[in-house]
Swiss-Prot record:
One of its GO terms (molecular function) is hydrolase activity, acting on acid anhydrides. Residues 473-627 form the Helicase C-terminal domain. This is RNA polymerase-associated protein RapA. It comes from Pseudomonas syringae pv. syringae (strain B728a). Interacts with the RNAP. Has a higher affinity for the core RNAP than for the holoenzyme. Its ATPase activity is stimulated by binding to RNAP. Belongs to the SNF2/RAD54 helicase family. RapA subfamily. Transcription regulator that activates transcription by stimulating RNA polymerase (RNAP) recycling in case of stress conditions such as supercoiled DNA or high salt concentrations. Probably acts by releasing the RNAP, when it is trapped or immobilized on tightly supercoiled DNA. Does not activate transcription on linear DNA. Probably not involved in DNA repair.
Length: 948
């Protein structure tokens, strides 16, 4: 007897019908491997419960050969477990077609099979299926797909960069925004949009070890991306041959990777579509030598098509270091440092001319001569129009110059000066007497920046002698919190021990409601603490964070920040302030800094305030100044030499002012315009906010929850609690937690309550729920009674829902041109299509349900009459399908031709346009047009309506 599965047999997936016809490749032990050639996907299933249905056609069925000729089946043979079909082709010739040669694009009329088998569903399920198809089609066509679902306020420059970069094939770019402008969010948006569109399916994220947790939190909380964090322990403990092959998104610390050659080999072997490198400016490169970290990233960049480098601004880095980043992206274009320097110098006068145009609205004779020399005669007409005040000509001139910018397509750099929306900062300093207990610490310890830690570690103290009972900063904190009453206050200190001690102090000494947040807590515990702090009515007044514990969190609903101590590096200070100082902060940031007089704390405060001006403004020069003056700074924090100290402060202040002046004069306004989007980002923001205000998603989700047996109840304003009910239909529904979850559709609520799921059309719960509806068969049949006086009792109407779709690899992004769309046909007894006159919702309002037994009895009695009418429906709907396909082909051809023309022209004046981009675009066009030619109609659902 033949085995159940044989290589070559054709099966269809019950849960992923969109994959097309599958072919059994192998049966290995308890695993079954099936290839889906239409999409290039391979799946492995457990042999005992594989969700597959055998494809077996019957006499009378019309089937298609992979070379696209058709035959009508007359006989079916089973030869060693494989089916062989015999029948007649279009020329009425006898032909044979083994199942191994069936077209991969054959569609199945499962709705018809279920209808005549008596599997008739509720009317609510039929409506849910139709609405799911409609929403899926709408979202796939949306320009916001992959941009609107992030848990963040929509910000113009971030959205512009994300769309511009994510819509490229294998993007290779440098994201170099100033601190606080959201490079991590930009990278997350690019990753998210590339994954949703299919342009990328495997992403590698390389970060410094101290940023791993921040990235993990950002990707999971903001984007719902399940990133796998790899370190030496996880890599060694994995049972897989190559642990990296088992994950779609890998987060890896560069420090570990450089030291582990086995991990490097596995990483290279795994294959990736996109690599993201954070803090790329720390990769050291010189003309004669590169660091191990740089060399490793360089080797990866050679084999990974898409590369995103997140880095400091070019002005901070210096030209040589900036060149080192660019050569990672395109070593052929950026191969000679001297040539790059010369090119940059040649371009500087053009950037200055644009600065003049933007500042004054017109161009001097010298600036016009500069632009003429850069654009040639073709720019003269634009210059003439600009001189008459033509705003459109001004925009076109800037675009022409940008297209010729040496790094305009690969570098995105926004500055705080160019981006609006940041709050002001106000500093409150509180010098306090240093307690004698700290002065009596062992020699050498009293100079510590964190004396409370030294006191606890060097003293065998009782509960009554703990440091927070005598430290004046604690008294000051209690008094300040009482003065601010119920105002939310964020406190940050360097160590987790200090944070926990402060919580104890507030509880014991004041009763002020407080919660703590540190690296020793897991993500769930941190979420609860953040939620307790965010709750306006019953929450904590104060949240006490350690340095590391607050990474990646956003507390901008608060605007009072207490720096209980000061960090040892200005970048860490900026990170602390950045918890509140973000775009969208509605209040002035109130910075409260208590410090102990005549201590290293006092001098460090003076260094940050007087030398670096780091409290009242961001300090882009802080890292350079710390590096330059650090060797002199640290000893003087401990020394009492006032003259040397004041000399250091004065020198550092002068150097900062000089560097800031260089940064300002070196600003490339043309590049800022490109990075900001010149209005395109604002349009995206408006569209996302409009989408947020619509009620279609909550209405749809309520019907989805009802269908699957998910109970929902009010939690608070704009929030719901979801729990699985006893009648839950499918345990695989992606609720996220078996015990239940709290959700909100409100973006502002989600930003302040990170314990709540932010539900958008892109959320895994929504996408997973919709997939369950469409991949299953529930709702593809229904029978109803229609109450309409215009219809004679007993009249039978037939409502047929077809899906017009193309089965193709997601990377081709054909969903933008031909998304799966529900085409509706409403046939009367005479074969007339009434769908254009009677909408789906209008019809629904006239229907009543029919008991299943009665419905089944009616269908069986009417089978012979219904079958030809169902077949006739496809003829009625085919012109609509053909029209959609033709329009999709036209749009695809037009879009790619326009982009090819633009890039080809651009390549002539800007070498950063790679040949590979043009080749990939042409290939994508040809493959896309060929796939659209195979687009098919599929009968998705049937509803039989009987007038009564």
């Amino acid at each position: 007897m033949a085995q159940q599965y044989q290589p070559g047999q054709r099966w269809i997936s019950d849960s992923e019908a969109e994959l097309g016809l599958g072919t059994v490749l192998a049966q290995d032990g308890r695993l079954l491997t099936v290839l889906y050639p239409a999409t290039g996907e391979t799946r492995q299933y457990a042999l005992r419960n594989a969700p597959l249905t055998r494809v077996r056609f019957s006499p009378g069925d019309v089937i298609t050969h992979f070379e696209n000729w058709k035959m009508t089946v007359r006989e079916v043979d089973d030869v060693d477990g494989l089916l062989v079909y015999h029948g007649l082709n279009a020329q009425n010739e006898l032909v044979t077609l083994p199942e191994t040669q069936l077209s991969n694009f054959i569609q199945f009329r499962l709705a018809t099979d279920r209808l005549f088998a008596g599997q008739i569903d509720q009317l609510s399920w039929f409506s849910l299926r139709y609405n799911t198809l409609e929403h899926t089609s709408r979202q796939l066509q949306s320009s916001l797909w992959g941009l609107g679902g992030v848990r963040a306020q929509p910000i113009a420059h971030q959205l512009h960069i994300a769309r511009e970069v994510a819509d490229r094939i294998a993007p290779r770019v440098l994201l170099a925004d100033e601190v606080g402008l959201g490079k991590t969010i930009e990278a997350g948006l690019v990753i998210h949009r590339q994954l949703l569109s299919g342009r990328a399916s495997r992403v590698l994220i390389l970060v410094p070890e101290n940023l791993q947790h921040q990235w993990l939190v950002e990707m999971r909380r903001r984007f719902n991306l399940q990133v796998a964090l790899f370190d030496a322990e996880r890599f060694m403990e994995s049972d897989a041959g190559n642990p990296f092959e088992d994950t779609q998104l890998a987060l890896v610390a560069l420090e570990w990777l450089v030291e582990d050659e086995k991990a490097q080999d596995a990483l290279f072997a795994a294959g990736w579509d996109l690599m993201v490198v954070d803090e790329a400016h720390h990769l050291v490169w010189h003309e004669d030598k590169a660091s191990r970290e740089y060399s490793l990233v360089e080797q990866l960049a050679e084999v990974i098509a898409g590369v995103l480098l997140l880095t400091a601004t070019p002005e901070q880095l210096g030209q040589d270091s900036h060149f080192a980043r660019l050569r990672l992206l395109d070593p052929n274009r950026f191969h000679d440092l001297k040539a790059f320097r010369a090119e940059s110098e040649n371009y500087r006068p053009v950037a200055q001319a644009v600065q003049e145009l933007l500042d004054k609205g017109k161009l001097s004779a010298a600036a016009q001569e500069t632009i003429h020399g850069f654009l040639g005669a073709e720019g003269d007409s634009l210059l003439a129009a600009v001189n008459t005040g033509d705003e459109e000509a001004k925009s076109r001139l800037i675009r022409e110059l940008l297209d010729r910018h040496g790094t305009g397509r690969v570098l995105f750099r926004n500055t705080r000066a160019a981006v609006q929306g940041f709050p002001e900062r106000k500093l409150h300093q509180y010098p306090l007497p240093c307690p004698v207990e700290y002065l009596e610490l062992p020699v050498g310890e009293h100079a510590d920046l964190y004396p409370e830690v030294s006191f606890q570690s060097h003293s065998d103290v009782s509960e009554e002698e703990r440091w927070w009972r005598f430290d004046p900063r604690v008294d000051w904190l209690i008094d300040t919190l009482k003065m601010l009453k119920r105002v939310k206050v964020l406190v940050i200190c360097a160590h987790a021990e200090t944070a926990m001690d402060l919580e104890d102090a507030l509880r014991v000494r004041s009763g002020i409601p407080a919660t703590v947040f540190h690296e020793g807590m897991n993500i769930l515990e941190r979420d609860r603490a953040a939620a307790y702090f965010a709750d306006e009515e019953f929450g904590a007044q104060v949240l006490i964070c350690s340095e590391i514990g607050s990474e990646g969190r956003n507390f901008q609903f608060s605007h009072h920040l207490v720096l209980f101590d000061l960090p040892s590096h200005p970048d860490l200070l900026e990170q602390r302030i950045g918890r509140l100082d973000r775009i969208g902060q509605k209040h002035t940031i109130e910075l409260h800094v208590p410090f102990l007089e005549t201590s290293p704390q006092a001098r460090l405060f003076q260094w940050y305030h007087e030398a670096l001006n780091a409290f009242l403004n961001t300090c882009p020069t802080g890292n350079a100044l710390q590096h330059q003056f650090g060797p002199r700074l640290l000893p003087l924090l401990e020394s009492g030499d006032d003259d040397k100290w004041q000399t250091l402060i004065n020198e550092a202040r002068s150097e900062r002012e000089r560097l800031e002046s260089e940064l300002h004069t070196g600003r490339d306004r043309l590049l800022e315009l490109n990075s900001g989007g010149a209005g395109e980002g604002e349009a995206l923001v408006e569209a996302i906010l409009d989408q947020d205000d619509q009620f279609s998603l909550p209405i749809y989700m309520e019907t989805l929850f009802d269908a699957f047996g998910i109970d929902s109840e009010d939690h608070s304003e704009n929030a719901l609690i979801l729990k699985p009910s006893e009648k839950m239909l499918d345990a695989s529904f992606p609720l996220g937690d078996d015990e239940g979850v709290t959700i909100t559709y409100d973006r502002n609520q989600a930003l302040s309550r990170e314990d709540m799921q932010f539900i958008t059309w892109e959320h895994p719960m929504v996408q997973g729920g919709m997939d369950l509806v469409l991949s299953g068969s529930m709702g593809n049949t229904a029978v109803a009674l229609i109450k309409n006086k215009a219809l004679k009792p007993g009249t039978v109407l037939l409502e047929l829902i077809y899906v017009s779709e193309v089965v193709a690899p997601r990377s081709l992004q054909l969903g933008r041109y031909l998304p799966p769309a529900a085409l509706r046909c409403l046939l009367d007894p005479n074969g007339n299509d009434l769908a254009s006159r009677v909408s789906f919702n209008t019809l629904n309002d006239q229907l009543e349900s029919v008991p299943r037994a009665s419905a089944n009895k009616f269908i069986q009695a009417q089978r012979d009459q219904l079958t030809p009418r169902i077949n006739a429906g496809e003829e009625k709907i085919m012109p609509k399908h053909a029209e959609r396909v033709a329009e999709a082909q036209r749009r695809l051809a037009a879009d790619t031709e326009e982009e090819l023309a633009r890039l080809t022209a651009l390549q002539a004046v800007n070498p950063t346009v790679r040949d590979s981009e043009l080749v990939a675009l042409r290939t994508q066009r040809e493959q896309g047009l060929a796939m659209l030619e195979k687009a098919a109609l599929r009968l998705e659902a049937i509803r039989v309506l009987v007038a009564g």
